[in-house]
Amino acid sequence: MADMLGLMQRLEFAVSRLERLSSGLHEPPGGCGEVNSLSRGIVAPSVEAFDKLINSMVAEFLKNSRVLAGDVETHAEMVHGAFQAQRAFLLMVSQHQQPQENEVAVLLKPISEKIQEIQTFRERNRGSDMFNHLSAVSESIAALGWIAVSPKPGPYVKEMNDAATFYTNRVLRDYKHSDLRHVDWVRSYLKIWSELQAYIKEHHTTGLTWSKTGPVASTASAFSILSSGPGLPPPPPPPPPPGPPPPFENEGGKEEPSPSRSALFAQLNQGEAITKGLRHVTDDKKIYKNPSLRAQGQIRSPTKTRTPSPTSSKSNSPQKHAPVLELEGKKWRVEYQEDRNDLVISETELKQVAYIFKCDKSTLQIKGKVNSITVDNCKKFGLVFDHVVGIVEVINSKDIQIQVMGRVPTISINKTEGCHLYLSKDALDCEIVSAKSSEMNVLVPQGDDYREFPIPEQFKTIWDGSKLITEPAEIMA
């Protein structure tokens, strides 16, 4: 009897287990069974490798950013969110076949929104003391767009990494002798992109590798992967398509159908019988059979002239910003100045810096001695200063004139069209570093006047058997 009871218990256990397995097999795609399988870690090797990158390199960067706190930490959290969005996309890629190109663009939208959020954060915090940190991230986060690059996504990531080093070098220059936490931050951030290049080389060498089995990816099939985390209940399935519209009935509280709308639905309900109302057109009224009608030319239907709304001109005009000339902590902010030639900063200290942004047709004079000056996104702007102990930088600008009254060790010119440097006798030993710029001239004093020397824009590189030798290509007489 005991053996019989034990056998019955084992049979009941087996039946219940089979029922559970059967219900799991019949679950619709995106159901709880799929989420449970994901929570058990059944993922493709490429996704596992990407998880390792997030859990090691991105986590290390996030830890170092939390040490610096403030805007850097907030920015790093956004970066972590962008990598999580890319991880969800790669998971979908490993389980689905490649869809049409327009569908791929829709599926990439969560990642592109994360990238845009990171770049917008930098633009909204230009006055931040950690602006170089934010710029390093903002200028390189587009590397996550490698998933849309073929056949060589790896070099694309390297190109974005190079864009970051322009700003990380600034961070290293400012903190390498004073605060090593920033040095660790730079190393951990750049390590992310070098590891991502290695990941791409191993798993997606010539472009994104989609699954060759499974359903074709779509917004419906991938919704649960892109928007739900492992272990969470999936979103409900989309509602069924709506049925035919209800008939218009004269009920209390409902809008009365207009006669024209009722007539329209009455005609639609005729079906093919609607063509019975068409009358026959005789040959003398057909243009292609009647030369006299052709001679009259085409009859053009009257077109309605569209008057622009009063708000259209406002929406197209660029947004005006209030001009700024103020001291924030140790930073002088000079922003959005237009047609001002009387700007002066006279009360300066050695530890102060000046940041000049989006000034047009203006001139600024800085008296005394400051640490550094940055001219960013300015046009037809003149700068006169006494002494700078660090560096003067000009970036993303056009038609800039700088006059040095005292001394400056380094002047950097990047992505600028037109920059004239008037040096004093005490500043003749300064270093001038330029990149991606044109129409640069240095004017040195000679008696009571200046002599102009152009900075080379064209270079010649040769191989001498052991190394590359680069020198200016002198083509001027």
UniProtKB/Swiss-Prot annotation:
One of its GO terms (biological process) is cAMP-mediated signaling. Residues 300-318 have a biased composition (Low complexity). This is Adenylyl cyclase-associated protein 2. Involved in the regulation of actin polymerization. Residues 318-455 form the C-CAP/cofactor C-like domain. The keyword Mitochondrion does not apply. Residues 224-262, 274-324 are annotated as: Disordered. InterPro entries: Adenylate_cyclase-assoc_CAP, Adenylate_cyclase-assoc_CAP_C, C-CAP_CF_C-like, CAP/MinC_C, CAP_C_sf, CAP_CS_C, CAP_CS_N, CAP_N. GO terms for molecular function: actin binding; adenylate cyclase binding; identical protein binding. GO terms for cellular component: cytoplasm; glutamatergic synapse; plasma membrane; postsynapse; postsynaptic density. It is a peripheral membrane protein. Residues 231-248 have a biased composition (Pro residues). Transmembrane segments: none annotated. Belongs to the CAP family. PROSITE patterns: C_CAP_COFACTOR_C (PS51329), CAP_1 (PS01088), CAP_2 (PS01089). The modification Phosphoserine is found at residues 301, 309.
